[in-house]
């Protein structure tokens, strides 16, 4: 029995973009474009007659912007929405606003200047649509009230240097996450105390956005969150997010862990790649590492987590029920590299239980 095609509604004020996206999607045998609209009002009229499986939405449009329309969709009838806009490439705040409003994924507008770029964009868009059609779309959480911080003398001058450096860590956590990860990471990191172990994170995100993403998380969390830089010494109570477009590896010199940022080709179709991070953690931390694979499409991280598992690391995977896309965890479980499958809400507790229970193992 043939599976029904994934039905897509395209909302973009550019006729040429609508045509390019329609051509790309209709070329995939599993997808069909049911309709297109030049603005949110035309799209809303179409939605009264027919509900698509996935919506592809621009941001800058006449009469109503895409973010406002996205919020209305999520409030009335949640549908997986993929943002396709050049604005998200230029302004990181717009990207985070889209995710917070309920966007499933953000995909750059297709480039047609070269055949390679068009093929790459086509594959990325079709993959995103297929993942969105399988996704679990949940009602959005109300935004948190932000209380203005009480300032100290640090606002005027830095505190005196005590001569005592922050402790390095013998144990650390490595996390690989993709689609749905921006909100999932917030859920995890917000719950961790300042004494949490060091955490190295690969979140699939475009180049230029990870610094702003880290800064946003840092403002919400007790632990420090920063974009990783080459040579960073890994310390307790700090989370390091791999910079977009580059690989992050764990290395060790004597008793100190530090971070290496490397260029190179995409691994498992991604750069940064969770497989690269996990392999380096297996080599340099072994049983002193906790590897966690979370929501995301594809299989990045599955093989690397298995390597960590084989070299004595503790491993966890996010469960299907709490994943936006149960792709990366599913592949890791299938390979046999996962010790325990847990819901998203339990991951912070798993991290702290592991830190409190497991003694560091001497490593060479």
Swiss-Prot record:
InterPro entries: CheB-like, CheB_C, CheY-like_superfamily, Sig_transdc_resp-reg_Me-estase, Sig_transdc_resp-reg_receiver
Cellular compartments annotated: Cytoplasm
Active site as annotated: 178, 204, 300
Major localisation: cytoplasm
Catalytic reaction annotation: [protein]-L-glutamate 5-O-methyl ester + H2O = L-glutamyl-[protein] + methanol + H(+); L-glutaminyl-[protein] + H2O = L-glutamyl-[protein] + NH4(+)
Family label: Belongs to the CheB family.
PROSITE patterns: CHEB, RESPONSE_REGULATORY
Protein's recorded name: Protein-glutamate methylesterase/protein-glutamine glutaminase 3
EC number: 3.1.1.61, 3.5.1.44
Biological function: Involved in chemotaxis. Part of a chemotaxis signal transduction system that modulates chemotaxis in response to various stimuli. Catalyzes the demethylation of specific methylglutamate residues introduced into the chemoreceptors (methyl-accepting chemotaxis proteins or MCP) by CheR. Also mediates the irreversible deamidation of specific glutamine residues to glutamic acid.
GO cellular component terms given for this protein: cytoplasm
Organism, scientific name: Rhodopseudomonas palustris (strain BisB18)
Swiss-Prot/TrEMBL domain comment: Contains a C-terminal catalytic domain, and an N-terminal region which modulates catalytic activity.
NCBIfam families noted in UniProt: PRK00742.1, PRK12555.1
Keyword terms of this UniProt record: Chemotaxis, Cytoplasm, Hydrolase, Phosphoprotein
């Amino acid at each position: 029995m043939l599976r029904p095609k994934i039905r897509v509604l395209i909302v973009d004020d550019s006729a040429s973009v609508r045509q390019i996206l329609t051509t790309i999607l209709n070329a995939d045998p599993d997808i069909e474009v049911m309709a297109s609209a030049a603005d949110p009002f035309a799209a809303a009229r179409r939605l009264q007659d027919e509900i698509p499986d996935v919506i592809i939405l621009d941001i800058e449009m006449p009469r109503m912007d895409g973010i406002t329309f996205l919020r209305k969709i999520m409030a009335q009838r949640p549908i997986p929405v993929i943002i396709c806009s050049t604005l998200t490439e230029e302004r990181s705040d717009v990207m985070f606003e889209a995710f917070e409003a309920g966007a499933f994924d953000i995909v750059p507008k297709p480039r047609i200047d070269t055949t390679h770029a068009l093929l790459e964009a086509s594959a990325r868009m079709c993959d995103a649509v297929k993942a969105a059609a399988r996704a679990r779309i949940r009602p959005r959480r109300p935004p948190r009230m932000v209380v203005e911080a009480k300032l100290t003398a640090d606002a005027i001058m830095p505190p005196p240097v005590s001569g005592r450096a922050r402790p390095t860590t013998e144990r650390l956590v490595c996390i690989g996450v993709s689609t749905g990860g921006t909100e999932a990471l917030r859920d995890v990191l917000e719950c961790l105390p300042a004494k949490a172990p060091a955490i190295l994170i690969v979140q699939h995100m475009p180049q230029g956005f990870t610094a702003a993403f880290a800064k946003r998380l840092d403002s919400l969390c007790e632990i420090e969150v920063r974009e990783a830089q080459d040579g960073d010494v890994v310390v307790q109570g700090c989370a390091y997010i791999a910079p977009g477009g580059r690989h992050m590896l764990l290395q060790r010199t004597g008793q100190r862990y530090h971070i290496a940022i490397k260029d190179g080709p995409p691994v498992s179709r991604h750069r940064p790649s969770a497989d690269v991070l996990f392999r380096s953690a297996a080599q340099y931390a072994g049983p002193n590492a906790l590897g966690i694979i979370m929501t995301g499409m594809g299989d990045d991280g599955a093989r690397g987590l298995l390597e960590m598992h084989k070299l004595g690391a503790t491993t966890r995977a996010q469960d299907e029920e709490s994943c936006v896309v149960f792709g990366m965890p599913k592949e890791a479980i299938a390979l046999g590299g996962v010790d325990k499958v847990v819901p998203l809400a339990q991951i912070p507790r798993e991290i702290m239980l592991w830190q409190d229970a497991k003694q560091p193992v001497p490593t060479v």
